[in-house]
From Swiss-Prot:
One Pfam short name: MinE
Coiled coil: none
Record's function text: Prevents the cell division inhibition by proteins MinC and MinD at internal division sites while permitting inhibition at polar sites. This ensures cell division at the proper site by restricting the formation of a division septum at the midpoint of the long axis of the cell.
Species assigned in the record: Photorhabdus laumondii subsp. laumondii (strain DSM 15139 / CIP 105565 / TT01) (Photorhabdus luminescens subsp. laumondii)
Family under the similarity heading: Belongs to the MinE family.
Protein name from the UniProt record: Cell division topological specificity factor
Amino acid sequence: MALLDFFLSRKKTTANIAKERLQIIVAERRRGDSEPAYLPDMKRDILAVICKYIQVDPDMLSVQFEQKGDDISVLELNITLPEAEETQK
């Protein structure tokens, strides 16, 4: 009987596939909303401190906040620094 069920089973409809994809997108956005309200201000302050020593483009600074569990938060900071000759003021 299982063989008969295999051949008679229907493929997923496009509506079901779209629903699953939408659920994934919503779940990803919910995770992104967990960043604290102070994060944009912190990014601005970090950029100001870095600019005191090295001239960098604000677009070259990437700050990501990730919640890992209830009591662990990770703040990841990536900066693309200019070449050594350009860093001197």
